[in-house]
């Protein structure tokens, strides 16, 4: 079975090339080609034909193909359905902002978390993505769209911290000066609240932004919509977040979906304010996007504004997320891993 060359760091690639009798500078040439979008060794024109044939016999550099591309008529958001080498599919989204272009990528095929308001978890987890498959979503989204990517959010299909090792390697690859060279401060990683992995991430002391999907400040309602809360209740999760902030100095963003009758009461706003006090936290409020299977509904505009006002009155920074790509089901919680019948 051929090795996945694009999942290797430059140092690993240099060692692999040395093991087959090739100089290190060749590895750097290949690394650069791969991270510029080369999909075959034949495209690497500064390599000899014999070396290209040799590498092709040893390594797999198969790129994903575009199974479907949708462009929002509302705001130009682009959603890609990528077909992977094994036939599985994942989605990623390119969003245009005044401050630059952001790509939202998936970390797994399917998702193990079971959140009731999210389409990505329907059907459960199939497999974790390889580092190369994360890189390719960023790279080929940029190449196909023609929009230079300046920011990455790991908020697509899957739980990034459930795929911890591969995601950490992806971060190293995407941050490499010889690769796409996207700075850590331009990367956001979202988690549903895997406390053990948050603790592990804190030890890495990375300069990325950690986004925690909270969605409720009380265990009763959070457990109903997020099964992970039964293992790591709200207070346990927030203790890990405080420790993360203390170790890294990086402010945490809390994702908070506004769900009618579930997470939007004034009492919950007061409780959330109390539990986040002193953390320098930012609350990113998200109107629930439609997922037919969930049976849940977004909060009223009045409830959303009242909730936000209570947070701000208590000294908690809160913003309302702008919804992009809603006409192509590209908004938060709407990504799926396969074609939908129409």
Functional labels for PLM-detected ranges:
Residues 89-94:
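A short loop-to-beta-strand scaffold at the N-terminal edge of the catalytic core in hydrolase folds
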Residues 72, 106-107, 120, 190, ...:
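Short linear Ser/Thr-Pro motifs
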Residues 121-151:
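Conserved alpha-helical substructure of the radical SAM core
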Residues 96-133:
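Canonical Radical SAM [4Fe-4S] cluster-binding loop centered on the CxxxCxxC motif
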